[in-house]
């Protein structure tokens, strides 16, 4: 349904790169990474999962196990700042725990290949072991399929929904970083979330509950008007028991604003099912990248 805006061919050869922390209020010294020289042909978004490019600084990342140092960042789209691979709650004060990057991608409108925002999906560090147990062969064998491959089950519309639902039921916490690639406003961000939730089949089966939850979501946005410039950030965090915390980051002023919470858990459930499962996920590159992240845990 969605197509990446990164379509190019290029070749790189490098041996040493440096990166720096972006979102710490007390930035640490720049670290150096030594990476063996390589020549890499890149074509399309899916081929650059393991490669970050920012201001001529390159990082080679293993697709199956990313470096989650707080000093490492990932290039999601050339028009916005890279995303950190680790979120430290002591520095990222809008978050309630520490997170590591699970996957990332770009949300696009297919019929015009119109990029909307870059998105990164994170998993709570404290919930990684729980997730590994849920996604273990013992649990996967209960699906009654001949093939218990985690990758194939995560790629299957029906089984992926069951797996993600199980993670959410077991209170595995996730966070999402949304960064518009062009200027927008709070109203468009709110409408996008509402449309995504209503597009999930379960919303029709739970109309009253979903309606109440969406009213909470509208109330969270009710005090926020006006523009959201490109490269600003909307944060979504699933709390225990399924509440959804929403906050806004202005990187120019280095300000974080807590907007509020949606208490009804079906809202966070349907939204994250849309990100991680089903026939038509909100961003196929994000879903594929997160599948790699789950497998690499």
Swiss-Prot record:
Pfam families in UniProt: Chalcone_2
Keyword Lyase: no
GO molecular function: intramolecular lyase activity
Keywords: Mitochondrion, Transit peptide
Keyword match Protein biosynthesis: no
Cystines in this chain: none
Transit peptide segment: 1-35
UniProt superkingdom: Eukaryota
Subcellular location: Mitochondrion
GO terms under cellular component: mitochondrion
InterPro entries: Chalcone_isomerase, Chalcone_isomerase_3-sand, Chalcone_isomerase_sf
Family: Belongs to the AIM18/AIM46 family.
PANTHER family: FATTY-ACID-BINDING PROTEIN 2 (PTHR47284:SF3)
The protein, known as: Altered inheritance of mitochondria protein 18, mitochondrial
Organism: Debaryomyces hansenii (strain ATCC 36239 / CBS 767 / BCRC 21394 / JCM 1990 / NBRC 0083 / IGC 2968)
Biological classification of the source: Eukaryota, Fungi, Dikarya, Ascomycota, Saccharomycotina
Designated gene of the protein: AIM18
